[in-house]
Amino acid sequence: RPAVIIVSDAAIAQLAEAGLVRREAVVGIGRTGTGLAVRDGAPRRPIGTPDQLKAALLAAGSIAWADASSGANAGRNFEGVIEALGIAAEMRAKAKLVRFGVEAVEACGRGEAELAVSQTTEIVNRPGCSLLGEFPAPFALSTGYAAAPVEAGELARAVMARLASAEVRAALDAIGFRSGGDTP
């Protein structure tokens, strides 16, 4: 059994509701958005508005994302985005579907896709590609993460204290987490 668990805010809330973690002990870790990775050397088109996002997606020669059936949040969100933009058929014709968002980013980094969809924290600092940007409203999806001790004891206290340290905050910032998750 782990001393501490770090999962999405939604999962922490379920664990608290089930009595597996104490709600008052939950600490927000940060938030990450869903966005696009662009392969190094590929055009960096703007995606700050729905029209710009649509144009960038249509202009890309290939795009990788997590198959929505795998349960990946970014993949499910992207399926809704391309449906709403009216370009689902065009995107599926040039899709490289993978199981997880990080695999989409890795495929982009290897040159197997011009763009990739994933959580921004899975894009930042990946070789061969970089973050083009987060999806604009109304397509933005932000996921919060939180930590909670699963058991009482010195190890759990030490881990929770470390998670609250300036060094860990700097490391989380460096990989794209925005400060403060919800504390369900």
Predicted regions mapped to residue ranges:
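Exported/periplasmic ABC-transporter solute-binding proteins
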Residues: R1-A3, S8-T32, V38-P184
